[in-house]
Design a protein with these regions (language model features):
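Catalytic core of soluble alpha/beta enzymes
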Residues: 77-209, 217
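Surface-exposed, flexible loop/turn segments at secondary-structure boundaries
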Residues: 52, 163, 214
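Structural signal for conserved beta-strand scaffold positions within catalytic alpha/beta enzyme cores
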Residues: 46, 180, 229-230
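N-terminal capping/lid subdomain adjacent to the active-site entrance of alpha/beta enzymes
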Residues: 1-104, 109-111, 115-118, 122-126, ...
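Residues at the C-termini of beta-strands that transition into short coil/loop
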Residues: 48, 159, 210, 231, ...
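Buried hydrophobic packing segments
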Residues: 15, 19-23, 195, 215-219
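Active-site pocket-lining/capping segments in soluble small-molecule metabolic enzymes
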Residues: 212-241, 246
């Protein structure tokens, strides 16, 4: 039903991550070191919040709070409101709140058609926007190539690459400036390593998409590593959540991925079906 781009690949990715975690644990090494990478902290941006609210005061307050969480140097802004003016007003509210030195990528979550994406992208070109992410449907490579050719702001795609070949095809089509694969969809650690080689050959900066607890390890060994997307979704059920210091993710010096569940929290949040 889902084909090779659906549930089967998600399952393979999960098993692959577990496999690499087990190997690193057996070796007594953090996964990053087991993969041959350094343990240096990874530049991270805060991807919690900054959604499509029309309350610009609340949006500004949230932006200041997100930057202060870990002295972040970047935070993602969600756009895709009913009008261009509303999106620009929201972006400016965040920019005014955090100042000129904080990088502000934006994500449209595939919410626009190509004509509107070009229109809003042109407006964002004048707003010191760090990147434009997934403005149109994820597999419209012709459209993304047109955006990259006509806009000044870097074009970021990749969370919907299903396997490393998708990344190769996107880069061959000149459909993006930067790439950001998702561990669940790219093929786990093995798929990530393949994608990292492709990105290196293309000279394409490569960021991660969510799963920061594992992504930090694979980013450490990525030659063109760019930004780790940080979200704290799993923190409430983790014994030791991923640490952020001075805007960087600190790779845990524990065997494997270092992920350990807070069993009491897991039971507290569990749903009985």
């Amino acid at each position: 039903l889902f084909g090779h781009k659906g549930l089967p690949l998600y399952a393979v990715s999960g098993l692959d991550m577990a496999y690499w975690d087990a190997l690193a644990q057996a070796a007594g090494l953090p996964l990053a070191r087991f993969l041959g990478g350094p343990m240096d902290p990874i530049p991270a941006y805060n991807s919690n919040g900054l959604g499509l609210t029309d309350d610009l005061g609340a949006l500004a307050d949230e932006a200041r709070s997100l930057i202060a969480m870990g002295d972040f140097k970047a935070a993602k802004v969600r756009l895709g409101r009913d009008t261009l003016d509303a999106d620009i007003a929201a972006f400016r509210a965040v920019r005014d709140a955090v100042g000129p030195d904080v990088k502000l990528p934006v994500d449209f979550n595939q919410g626009l058609d190509l004509e509107e994406a070009l229109k809003r992208g042109a407006a964002l070109d004048a707003e010191d926007c760090y990147w434009i992410e997934e403005a149109i449907v994820y597999d419209n490579m012709t459209g993304y190539a047109k955006m990259k050719a006509e806009l000044k702001t870097p074009i970021q795609i990749g969370e919907n690459f299903h396997g490393a070949r998708d990344m190769s095809d996107a880069l061959a089509a000149d459909a993006c400036t930067w790439v950001m694969p998702d561990l669940q969809r790219i093929g786990g650690v093995t798929g990530w390593r393949c994608a990292a080689t492709i990105a290196e050959e293309a000279g394409a900066p490569m960021s991660s998409h969510i799963y920061p607890e594992v992504s930090a390890h694979v980013m450490a060994g990525t030659p063109t590593a760019h930004w780790l997307e940080y979200s704290d979704w799993a923190a409430p059920v983790m014994a030791e959540p991923l640490k952020i210091e001075n805007g960087h993710a600190v790779i845990p010096d524990r065997p494997g991925t270092g992920v350990a569940w807070d069993e009491d929290a897991v039971k507290r949040y569990a749903l009985e079906l």
